[in-house]
Curated annotation (Swiss-Prot):
It comes from Candida albicans (strain SC5314 / ATCC MYA-2876) (Yeast). Residues 616-697 are annotated as: Knob domain. Residues 119-153, 212-224 have a biased composition (Polar residues). Residues 172-187 have a biased composition (Low complexity). ATP binds at residues 361, 416-423, 470-471. The gene is PAN3. It is found in: Cytoplasm. This is PAN2-PAN3 deadenylation complex subunit PAN3. SUPFAM superfamilies: Protein kinase-like (PK-like). PANTHER family: DEADENYLATION COMPLEX SUBUNIT PAN3, PAN2-PAN3 DEADENYLATION COMPLEX SUBUNIT PAN3. InterPro entries: Kinase-like_dom_sf, PAN3, Pan3_PK, Prot_kinase_dom, Znf_CCCH.
């Protein structure tokens, strides 16, 4: 671009107009960087020349030359703005076009009343040179009270506004603005005072900034599933568990509760599909060498739940042989809906004998239990080993929870622990993210529940209150288990119970299975149709459920438990065609898990080798063997390519470590700054084993 250097020095740089500064100001930019516009400088010069009594020819010539320069400019800021004439318009919208003089002009108001005439040149600043107007009213939320600020600053400005800014109208006509601009142009450019041009006093600005900082809403966390407000964890701190409402440790646990969950994505994540590089059949990437990210995160969450602890609680330190109690009931509703008049809570605990984790369900008060007769069925419950039943381990009564103050006895039942398991009620109805119900899922649940019922009935027992949406837990994808088994046998114990009573209760179990599945099936209906008298016709007409599943649900729900007969074995045979789908999915899942275990099989071997190498390189002995080991580690981890760029290749590390662990005869070249060594993996392995053996001795 050709630039006329004579005229460029009088032209304001466009970077000043656009950005407010020019980074090439002291680096050769030929344009003017004076914030006072050249037109205003020329007008100020003319005004000062007119005020003198003698006009010299030189001043006249300079004025003429300045006029010529201004006429040659591409843009003239003093050109009057275009004003359309609306008097000659004849269309019907001509009355809607406003006149230029009627357009309201924004004028910033100052909280301090100023005189009409400007006396001090230090209190004025040209309007065009201001970048920000501090006196512009800022946005004020309606849910905050600024009464104190407005009262404290009422003497400085308008008391009716929250920040002390005058509430006078901001509309001025065009003539007043032109007069004000002329007065500004007559004044020389000066450094503005803190209170000039509507600027806030320092104390006022401090209050506004402090309000803006203190009123910022707390950020929510994307990665936390329950959207709880938590604080950032500190390294080495315990992960607190859930706290019972009203417990002594509630405040302390809330103060130490982490703001963010564990960062499971700290591992190298898989790239998004759009960035995945297509691979050849003989190629692979590092993601295929290790466990998938979703499975790893799923298992990490289970481990986190297992290691969760609770400090500063009012729970007993030991209950029989169990300790380290942590509440895991998410509902925090101690009043039981199944066992009337009882309070029920669930805890995670550690067994002091075998060190395993278990679940303790505490039910109180249970003062009616005065001997061991109600526990006579516990041995049969412990003998049941079924994939769809949570194993019962122990049952006893204790007074450890009340400290012998109230005298109430608590019933404690110990079950196997499945971390992060939720009930069907939370999974499909009342959870944050409910799982939709379909026909395949109903068949899956029906087969698993029938499998559990058959195992219970073979022992001469009944599930009773266990078959409920709140007592059936989901331990894995589409895997359910009956929990809280054996409680009804203890709380509803009868000495004179006959075989006919047991048979009636077993028929009630089958009917409850139908009711549970019906509660899930009606979730497919609209809300206004879920209370219909003929619910089966509504399911056939308004859902995609097959007639076969609806007929099975109707058969289970219409069972006569008083005098009816039901052959559970014959009913299970009718479910055989649907069982093949479940068997197929279970076998596929088993193959997948076995494949993942196979990929992780050699991790322990390589870890032992790396641990051995680290022991050797940090040994204080100086020998030739130490030099060889360090050269090998440099060969593996400190390689550079032809562009002098460090090579970071996981595949290379795994290949070299595996070759070293196997001790093959392949030779490698180990290079140092002064020398090089040719050695085989077999010789290197013998050196490492010998040195490690000597170090141990």
């Amino acid at each position: 671009m050709n630039i006329n250097l004579d005229t460029a020095k009088d032209t304001l740089c466009k970077n000043i107009l656009i950005y407010g500064y020019c980074k090439y100001e002291n680096k050769g930019c030929a344009f003017s960087h004076n914030r006072q516009q050249p037109a205003q400088q020329q007008q100020a010069t003319n005004t000062s020349n007119n005020s003198t009594s003698v006009i010299t020819p030189n001043s006249a010539n300079s004025t003429a030359s300045s006029a010529d320069l201004s006429s040659k400019k591409k843009f003239n800021l003093n050109t009057p703005s275009f004003q359309p004439s609306v008097s000659n318009l004849s269309n019907k919208f001509s009355t809607l076009s406003p006149k230029l003089k009627e357009i309201p002009v924004f004028k910033p108001e100052n909280g301090v009343s100023e005189p009409d005439t400007v006396d001090s040149p230090t209190t004025q600043r040209p309007f065009t040179s201001k970048r920000f107007n501090v006196s512009t009213p800022s946005f004020t939320p309606t849910n905050f009270d600024f009464a104190n600020n407005s009262n404290a600053d009422g003497n400085r400005g308008g008391a009716s506004t929250p920040i002390g800014i005058s509430s006078a109208p901001l509309v001025q006509n065009q003539q007043q603005q032109q007069q004000q601009q002329q007065q500004q142009q007559k004044q020389p450019l000066a450094v503005p005072s803190p209170l000039a041009s509507g600027a806030q006093p320092p104390t006022m600005q401090h209050r506004i900034l402090s309000m803006g900082v203190s009123q910022s809403s707390p950020s929510t966390n994307p990665y936390f599933a329950n959207n709880l407000d938590m604080s950032a964890p500190t390294p080495g701190s315990e992960t607190p568990g859930p706290v019972l409402p009203g417990s002594a440790g509630a405040a302390a646990a809330a103060a130490n509760q982490p703001m963010y969950p564990l960062q499971y994505h700290l591992y190298a994540p898989a790239p998004p599909p759009r960035l995945t590089i297509p691979l050849q059949p003989y190629e692979t990437n590092s993601q295929a060498m290790f466990i998938p990210n979703d499975l790893r995160e799923y298992l990490h969450k289970k481990n986190e739940a297992s290691l969760q602890s609770l400090s500063h609680s009012n729970l007993p330190e030991h209950v029989n042989q169990y300790h380290s109690l942590v509440p895991i009931d998410k509902s925090y509703e101690p009043v039981s809906k199944l066992w009337l008049g009882k309070n029920s809570l669930i805890f995670k605990c550690l067994d002091n004998i075998d060190g395993n984790l278990y679940v303790m369900r505490k039910i109180e008060p249970c003062n009616e239990i005065i001997n061991e007769k109600p526990f006579k069925t516990i041995k049969r419950w412990k003998s049941i080993k079924n994939a769809n039943i949570v194993g019962l381990q122990d049952a006893f009564t204790t007074m450890a929870f009340n400290g012998n103050q109230s005298g109430n006895t608590s019933l404690c039942i110990i079950y196997d622990y499945y971390p992060n398991s939720i009930s069907l009620l939370e999974h499909h109805k009342k959870g944050l993210r409910v799982e939709p119900v379909n026909e395949a899922l109903l068949w899956n649940y029906l087969i698993q529940l029938i499998n559990a019922i058959m195992a219970i009935h073979e022992k001469g027992l009944s599930a009773s209150s266990t078959i409920d949406l709140s007592k059936i837990i989901v331990t894995n994808k589409n895997r359910i288990k009956l929990s809280s088994v054996g409680i009804s046998d203890i709380l509803e114990f009868k000495d004179d119970e006959t075989n006919q009573d047991i048979k009636i209760r077993q028929l009630q179990d089958i009917q409850k299975v139908g009711k549970v599945l019906m509660e899930l099936a009606i979730l497919l209906l609209p809300v206004n149709m879920r209370q219909s008298n003929n619910i089966y016709n509504s399911l056939k007409a308004s859902t995609n459920l097959s007639e076969e599943i609806i007929n099975n649900l109707q058969e289970l729900n219409d069972l006569d438990t008083a005098s009816g007969e039901f052959d559970l074995n014959e009913f299970s045979q009718r479910l055989t065609p649907k069982m093949f789908n479940i068997i197929d999915s279970l076998q596929n899942s088993s193959d997948f898990i076995e494949g993942q275990l196979t990929s992780e099989l050699e991790n322990a071997r390589l870890f032992r080798l790396m641990t051995k190498l680290n022991y050797l390189i940090h040994d204080n002995s100086n020998s030739e063997n130490d030099k060889i080991i360090k050269l090998f580690l440099n060969y593996v981890y400190n390689c550079y390519d032809s562009n002098n760029k460090k090579v970071i290749n996981l595949n290379k590390v795994l290949i070299n470590l595996n070759k070293l662990d196997c001790g093959i005869d392949e030779k490698i070249l180990l290079v140092n700054n002064d020398e090089c060594i040719i050695i085989s993996y077999k010789e290197l392995k013998e050196i490492i084993d010998t040195k490690f053996r000597l170090m141990r001795e």
